[in-house]
Amino acid sequence: MGVHLVRHLEDCGDDVVQLERTVDGVDIVDAPEITEAVVAAKPTAVYHLAGAADVGGSWATPNETFLANALGTLNVLEACREAGAERVLAVTSADVYGRVTEDELPITEEQPLRPVSPYAASKVAADALAQQAWLGYGLPVVRVRAFNHLGPGQSDKFVAPSLAERIARNERDGGDEVPIGNMTPLRDVTDVRDVVRAYRLLVERGEPGDVYNVCSGRSVAVKEIADLLLDMAARPMRLVSDPALQRLVDIPVLVGDHGRLSRVTGWAPTIPLDQTLADVLADWRSRLAG
């Protein structure tokens, strides 16, 4: 996500200072360290995307997940106050909505939060901290609840990239099995390049203190994503159910309503799912060839 956001901001003519743990050694859990880095950057706007993103892994690492996503967000918000940032975009996750009933779909921002995983609970805390920073301190925070995003460069810890990685590996090595976990969940998937457009528009036009869903407004089954990728494979392959890839608890359906975002910014998703998946598969073919 960060690579795509930086590229989009630079394409729009913005001056970008990127703080990334693996590059700069800045840890958002270390309050003095993140404050020093943010203050030194003298930002007018801050995009906070950092944190733990492994939903399934959060069951085994709940403490680490909460520290990264809740304490990390608090530290970033405090650093932004210290730096005098004019706008902060705090990105959480649609997982905060948890289990919803059919009559609650598509999910609006008014939907009650029912976190299921430790990851989701940590994002609820981050969302609340961002709201408190606005209400309590007047920090101009715009909150985002991002549904599933997908695009080139994404980690194979996520479903679609992991499927694409295995297909590309099979094409190279001669295998024909593609392991997969639960195929029934319905997800709302948006191309990451559309998502970063939404983020910049929200920094420009979003209302401080408000929260916005970033989503496509359409649901797609994991099985459908897998079938689309298999259709793009260079030769026949088959899905194989792998219990090790099953999450402890899986939310059956997440599909959002981006009406508020569209009304405020004029944003709409533009890149179709089949194009996104083709780009993801091409990315993995390139990675494995290199």
PLM regions with names:
Residues V100-L105, Q131-D188, V192-L201, S219, ...:
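NAD(P)-dependent short-chain dehydrogenase/reductase
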Residues E10, V16-I34:
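Adenosine-cofactor binding site in Rossmann-like domains, unifying the SAM/SAH pocket
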Residues V195, Y199, V214, I225, ...:
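Non-catalytic, hydrophobic alpha-helical segments
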Residues A31-A68:
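NAD(P)H-binding glycine-rich loop region in Rossmannoid oxidoreductase-like domains
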Residues G2-V3:
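N-terminal Rossmann-fold NAD(P) dinucleotide-binding loop
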Residues L273-G290:
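Amphipathic terminal alpha-helices
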Residues A60-E78, E82, R87, V96-R143, ...:
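Catalytic helix-loop patch of NAD(P)-dependent Rossmann-fold dehydrogenases
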Residues V178, N182, V211-Y212, V220-D227, ...:
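C-terminal "lid/loop" region of Rossmann-like NAD(P)-dependent oxidoreductases
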